[in-house]
């Protein structure tokens, strides 16, 4: 049977029930008058209208008198021109670069973009800043990324400094058993590069040539700046022995200056006989002595271990830095001649850094990387020609000697290859640099173009013009 049709009485009763429920929720009374509900609705609507009117009024006032975007920003940049300005008290000064702006403001804040028209209504002061200071302050390399290399290409044709890990697979790292013969120019001393060091060798001395197997070897020509980056070892030459040819007191039956050997389970050991005992030496030192004076012996005499055991062990001759065995010359692989020699320097804690040599066909830059050619480049001259530091990065370093003793002046090196001295800790903080600087070799840093010192006093110098460069 169909339900009866809804009448107006049903609808009226339903509406009445809804009003009672609404009053109960709003006023806690099911019997509240409908006027109270009507008044609440009216006040809500009126409040919304007033809020809209107030918001429109604020927007109108902001349009007529906008609030300056300068606010309390210490450094701003004009949107239209990109010019930088720094606030000093209530005066805005144009500033030459971001490094100077941060030093003047004593903060590492970034510039806030503003309209040039806003700056037109402010107090303006003269130009401030350090000419030539970094315009951008890039992220410094981390300790694991900090490695230094100075390379010489084309027999002294150009020199390049590479900052960062060596990534060129064509470069061969010389092992401790390899060496390369170099000289800076015709007539200058010849050096043997081996084991992370350099030593002078006299190619006119037959004993040296034969002991190191340098017959027919022609030195590679390299820049002096590359040699300066290598720790120097004592000259490799036959040592002078006091009382040579006389009978030894320390080892009876043998002459002073003679070389003997004993056979161990691990191989042969060489000893030189001295007045008061014997000194252990390497194969190179043994050959140097024998090519100088073999004392008529065709072969190195072999003695029983118990014979030499009774002799005092001394350490008189300065031959400990000599290579133990004749190093193997590096001439490059077949079809790939050595055109570039590099000295690499990697910081190590504690003590001296690790120095190694690379030989290859070019500087060890990443694939696609191109070194920056410096304005001071002079080809075969003494100046550095190019620098590679990953674009958009910098290096915050402390100069260290090759011996590893202490740290000196701190520098910020930019990706354009210029080094800037850091005056103090406050300067480093204002520039946003890390707390600790990473060690770097001073002989390599010294080859980089030197920029002005970064200090708050230098940055605060007012100037009307900037003198043109040379």
UniProtKB/Swiss-Prot annotation:
GO cellular component, one term: extracellular region
Protein family (similarity comment): Belongs to the EccB family.
Assembly and oligomerization: Part of the ESX-4 / type VII secretion system (T7SS), which is composed of cytosolic and membrane components.
Membrane-crossing segments per the record: 44-64
Native organism: Mycobacterium tuberculosis (strain CDC 1551 / Oshkosh)
Protein's membrane topology: Single-pass membrane protein
Keyword Nucleotide-binding applies: yes
Pfam families xref list: T7SS_ESX1_EccB (PF05108)
UniProt KW Lipid metabolism keyword: no
EC number: 3.6.-.-
Lineage, opening ranks: Bacteria, Bacillati, Actinomycetota, Actinomycetes, Mycobacteriales
Top-level lineage group: Bacteria
GO molecular function, one term: ATP binding
Coiled coil: none
UniProt-listed InterPro entries: T7SS_EccB, T7SS_EccB_R1, T7SS_EccB_R3
Cell compartment(s), UniProt: Cell membrane
Keywords of this entry: ATP-binding, Cell membrane, Hydrolase, Membrane, Nucleotide-binding, Transmembrane, Transmembrane helix
Record protein name field: ESX-4 secretion system ATPase EccB4
Function: An ATPase.
